Regions:
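Walker A (P-loop) phosphate-binding motif
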Residues: 2-47
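Short, basic, glycine/proline-bearing loop/turn elements
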Residues: 12-19, 106-117
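N-terminal phosphate/diphosphate-binding loop that engages ATP/GTP or pyrophosphate donors
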Residues: 31-106, 316-317
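General beta-strand structural signal in soluble alpha/beta enzymes
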Residues: 43-47, 116-117, 138-143, 161, ...
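A generic structural motif
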Residues: 46-47, 262-269, 327-337
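Conserved catalytic-core segment of NTP-binding enzymes
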Residues: 120, 124-138, 143-323, 341
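Charged/polar low-complexity intrinsically disordered segments
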Residues: 342, 351-353
Length: 360
């Protein structure tokens, strides 16, 4: 069953969109509809707000989220009150969001729901841990790739990336940018000693010397353009807890004292550098590592932009597959092996395979 069987190998999955309207919610519904809930306990939540009928920016139609009977979910108090399903209340946490506390419940009937869960990475981790503690075997996170998001989808073991014409209607640009993001997702973990030392640190710029001692660079911000690296002759690892941007990466690349210094960020969502600067850094011998990462198992595409421009799906999928060496699926196709339930089917949500069967 395509990438569904791959998902079942992990205890958590995040589904993230390269940009709004790239088919993230369609991908989420596709996964939720096909998971074997009769033999797997599943919970779902969202980093942002998902399940709205209209995009608040483009004012275009959005697919709603449909939960099946027996699935667990975490959402804010505000959106829990707006649910259109019968549910059993499991927990009301101390985790506060702008829309109230996070409510965890079990769907007793299938139906539509708005999701807005934990708003920070630490809160998301706690919720996931609580779910696993009560016997949930797979946690699904509706994720976000945004500098404004305090919660990272990279806390999950596995990931699906949704891309599409909403990002760019130029196919080559879309393929190149998607391939770049895939490269970032695949950045390896740093060594175990660094993980233990750096994981608790959530702010600032730090370095580890050749004796394993940790030092804070209190005079440096990763977002500042006016700073100098001083007293770092023995730097072995340079850690940026916040956002990594072009200016900072360029200064690291041009500093001869940091030639052998491994650059570490929390995860790929903290990297906001251009492909050009990233490749220059690697070409100069630079090494980037992360503290947490997810296994990217598939990429989905939405070839139609909110403005109505449609790219050729077969060509786009072929070019992406060649560029990233991963399965690429167009879930918007009319020909699929399985269709979504009629109860929430507003558009045909489908999948391209080498062999296809007609939807009924």
């Amino acid at each position: 069953m395509t990438f569904i069987n791959e998902i079942l190998k992990y205890n958590s999955l995040s589904i993230v969109g390269l940009q709004k309207n790239t088919g993230k919610t369609v991908s989420l519904n596709y996964v939720l509809d096909r998971l074997p809930i009769e033999r797997k306990r599943i919970a779902v939540t969202s980093i942002g707000i998902d399940g709205e009928t209209t995009d608040q920016v483009t004012r275009t139609h959005k697919p709603e989220i449909y939960l099946r009977q027996g699935m667990y979910f975490g959402t804010s108090e505000m959106h829990y009150r707006q649910k259109r399903i019968v549910s059993e209340l499991i927990d009301v946490s101390d985790e506060n969001t702008s829309l109230g506390r996070v409510v965890t419940a079990k769907a007793l009937t299938g139906g539509k729901i708005l999701l807005s869960g934990p708003s920070s990475s630490s809160g998301l981790k706690r919720w996931m841990k609580d779910m696993h503690r009560v016997g949930i075997e797979l946690v699904i996170i509706d994720g976000a790739l945004s500098r404004n998001s305090l919660a990272s989808p990279a806390v999950s073991q596995s990931m699906i990336l949704a891309t599409g014409a909403a990002y760019s209607t130029n196919m080559n640009t879309l393929v190149q940018q998607t391939a770049f993001v895939v490269d970032l997702i695949k950045i390896p973990l740093t060594e175990e000693a660094n993980l233990k030392l750096l994981m608790p640190i959530e702010k600032g710029v730090w370095y580890i010397d050749d004796e394993g001692a940790l030092h804070e660079l209190s005079n440096i911000s990763s977002l500042s353009q006016d700073f100098r690296f001083e007293g770092m002759d023995r730097c072995k690892t340079l850690y940026v807890a916040g956002a990594l941007v072009d200016g900072f990466l360029e200064k690291v690349r041009k500093n001869p004292k940091l030639k052998t210094c491994e650059l570490v960020v929390r995860d790929f969502t903290k990297i906001f550098v251009s492909p050009q600067q990233y490749r220059l850094f690697l070409k100069a011998g630079g090494v980037i590592r992360v503290l947490q990462k997810s296994k990217l198992i598939a990429v989905t595409v939405n070839p139609t932009s909110p403005l109505g421009v449609t790219l050729d799906s077969d060509t786009l999928c072929a070019k992406l597959t060649e560029a990233i060496h991963l399965p690429v699926y167009d879930l918007m196709k009319d020909n699929v092996d399985v269709c979504v339930p009629q109860t929430y089917k507003t558009n045909s949500v489908c999948e391209t395979q080498t062999h296809t069967m007609r939807c009924n």
